[in-house]
Amino acid sequence: MAVKKRSIFEEVGQGAKAPVPQGGSIDRGHGGARRGIRLWLMALFLLVMAMIVVGGLTRLTDSGLSITEWRPVTGAVPPLNETQWAAEFDKYRDSPQYRLMNAGMTLAEFQRIYWWEWGHRQLGRVIGLVWAVGFLGFLAARRIPRGWWPRLLALGALGGLQGGIGWWMVASGLEGDKVTVESTRLATHLGLAFIILGLIAWQALLLGRSESDLLQARRQKDGRLVTLTTVLIGVAFLQIVLGALVAGIDAGRGFPTWPDMNGTFLPAEMFYVPGVETDWRNPAWWLGLLQNPGFVQFLHRMAGYTLAALGLIFWIFGRRSRHRATRGAFDLLAMALLAQILLGVGTVLSAAEWQVAIAHQVGAVVIWVLILHARHLALYPRVGSIRKGTL
């Protein structure tokens, strides 16, 4: 019987076809249309950002009280003829803002402010529709990654809550002798808008990388930078809310000087509340301070200085990261903070002229997103390569 000679270098099963490597359980278990959902979230992000800008312009043009009813569905159709316009104008003429601030306004002037508020509300309806179509579509196709549907559903729930808060805010300016909405309700409305925007941005950042990539990256996270950016998020959110309180009572127009406030560091009557005795133990006095232009403007400035100082200090720590992408994220954040400081000073010196004020608000959105981006890269760093020069 002949014995077949074999080389000691011959591989076992040389003729067999090698099996194709399979992904791990992480990649298999978290499938779905990650790229499609991310694009959908990015569209929602742009719409919410536009909503914040249009909302700011609606406030700056004193248009927010031009529609005196809340009709989420039927309100999507604006007045289409002279009779409908006259009826809508009559409703506005019954409001305190018309009687006390805009008496004698013409129909053409009313139409200009009406379109701002209608556009703001219509944009909200578009956001709701885009969310619903996307969520239900991905859900029906069973393309939502495992564990993600509660997060995406929560975005829609928060959007619905935001619509209700928007009307709650508007309603505060339609009673008594009010000509503007309550500043605290405005701050609640804007604060929730930034929360929604931040959640959308964070989910989009996560979906931009695979689950396995995120898991591996997290093993090299920089805990210190994660903590620092978390602190920065808190300070930035406080500053956003304070900015809304300033805007709600036009406090920026009463102190058009910098770095002083009409010649002093502490504005005159900073702790004065009409009709309420100054008492640190009295809650009514504390609430009344939120309507004091000098008090809220001073807090807004101090919070701005704090945010800028912390941001620049944290930038020094960010520059020490061994990951190039993380260092770049902190560089961008530092530059945005410097630009926002200039816009803030410009807003003060121009007595909150609308062009500068809206640029300042857009700057807040940019900084908010850049802080989240820096935190994301601190938590999930992109590992560079010496060979590719990406360290």
Curated annotation (Swiss-Prot):
GO terms for biological process: heme A biosynthetic process. Signal peptide: none annotated. GO terms for molecular function: metal ion binding; oxidoreductase activity, acting on NAD(P)H, heme protein as acceptor. It is an enzyme of class 1 (oxidoreductase). Coiled coil: none annotated. Its cofactor is heme b. Its main location: membrane. The keyword Acetylation does not apply. It is a multi-pass membrane protein. The keyword Nucleus does not apply. It catalyses: Fe(II)-heme o + 2 A + H2O = Fe(II)-heme a + 2 AH2. Its EC number is 1.17.99.9. Pathway: Porphyrin-containing compound metabolism; heme A biosynthesis; heme A from heme O: step 1/1. Keywords: Cell membrane, Heme biosynthesis, Iron, Membrane, Metal-binding, Oxidoreductase, Transmembrane, Transmembrane helix. InterPro entries: COX15/CtaA_fam (IPR003780), HemA_synt_rhodobact (IPR054616), HemeA_Synthase_type2 (IPR023754). Heme binds at residues 300, 360. GO terms for cellular component: plasma membrane. It is found in: Cell membrane. The chain crosses the membrane at residues 37-57, 121-141, 152-172, 186-206, 229-249, 298-318, 332-352, 354-374. Interacts with CtaB. Belongs to the COX15/CtaA family. Type 2 subfamily. Catalyzes the conversion of heme O to heme A by two successive hydroxylations of the methyl group at C8. The first hydroxylation forms heme I, the second hydroxylation results in an unstable dihydroxymethyl group, which spontaneously dehydrates, resulting in the formyl group of heme A. PANTHER family: CYTOCHROME C OXIDASE ASSEMBLY PROTEIN COX15, CYTOCHROME C OXIDASE ASSEMBLY PROTEIN COX15 HOMOLOG. This is Heme A synthase. It comes from Cereibacter sphaeroides (strain ATCC 17023 / DSM 158 / JCM 6121 / CCUG 31486 / LMG 2827 / NBRC 12203 / NCIMB 8253 / ATH 2.4.1.) (Rhodobacter sphaeroides). The gene is ctaA.
